[in-house]
């Protein structure tokens, strides 16, 4: 009996010793605290910021940025308010006006946590082209977040650019960070433009490597965000130029191809 037990035990010990090699995978969307400042980790920090924006949730009805898009549909009267659909508090604008509403705090945390993650990536010092491309993507995502905040927490730029809007954070925060006061609408949009223009210069040579990277901003995405920001600030000619630049390399899809885009990630 012993001659069978000993080889079996030896096999278990060997399996236990090498299992870590198979299971300890290098994460692609997070880094440990002692690796945050490593330039090579900027891309992983951006990935983590992106995934947080779409995966963080507090309830079944508050999961990622898609929940905020559903909220916007209701606030803009794009859908009918029905009990079975939910988001009735959004229809009443309570989700941006009442501080203790669950979606109010969820939205605030989701966007500012994403900004903070981007700030962590942007704060790293590096000199490689890959590093600056990851930094450019973090800048584009931060601009997207501030663009969202500007549209949700104050009237339009054209109504009053000096109106108080939201706080601007450009550096990583800690538990000891002193909360900042609200910046004006003009200051928030200036932050958006500064980030997007810098992102554009960092991403000028960036090319996505396959369908798995379609979530990563490139110059087309940056120009699309610039077009939106120019529209919101009444700069019509600049908006048109940015929109033309955003669609470079793409043609209008057929109706069939458009429908396929919802089911096929390879569809352009």
Briefly describe each language-model feature range.
Residues 115-118, 189, 196, 243:
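Inward-facing hydrophobic residues that define packing positions of alpha-helical scaffold repeats
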């Amino acid at each position: 009996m012993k001659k069978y037990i000993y080889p079996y035990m030896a096999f278990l010990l060997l399996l236990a010793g090498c299992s870590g090699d198979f299971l300890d995978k290098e994460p692609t969307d997070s880094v440990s605290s002692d690796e945050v400042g490593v330039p090579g980790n900027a891309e992983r920090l951006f990935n983590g910021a992106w995934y947080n924006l779409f995966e963080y949730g507090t309830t079944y009805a508050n999961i990622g940025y898609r929940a905020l898009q559903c909220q916007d549909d209701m606030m803009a009267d794009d859908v009918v308010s029905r009990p079975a659909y939910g988001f009735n508090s959004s229809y009443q604008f309570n989700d941006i006006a009442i501080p203790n509403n669950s979606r109010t705090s969820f939205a605030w945390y989701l966007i500012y946590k994403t900004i903070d993650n981007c700030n962590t990536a942007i704060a790293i010092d590096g000199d490689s082209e890959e590093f600056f491309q990851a930094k450019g993507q973090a800048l584009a995502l931060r601009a997207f977040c501030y663009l969202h905040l500007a549209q949700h927490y104050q009237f339009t730029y054209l109504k009053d650019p000096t109106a108080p809007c939201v706080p601007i954070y450009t550096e990583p925060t800690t538990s000891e960070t002193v909360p900042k006061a609200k910046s004006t609408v003009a200051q928030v949009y200036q932050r958006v433009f500064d980030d997007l223009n810098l992102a554009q210069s960092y991403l000028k040579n960036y090319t996505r490597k396959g369908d798995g990277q379609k979530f990563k901003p490139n110059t087309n995405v940056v120009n699309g965000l610039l077009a939106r920001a120019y529209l919101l600030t009444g700069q019509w000619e600049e908006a048109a130029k940015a929109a033309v630049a955003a669609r470079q390399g793409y043609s209008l899809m057929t109706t069939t191809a458009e429908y396929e885009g919802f089911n096929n990630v390879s569809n352009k």
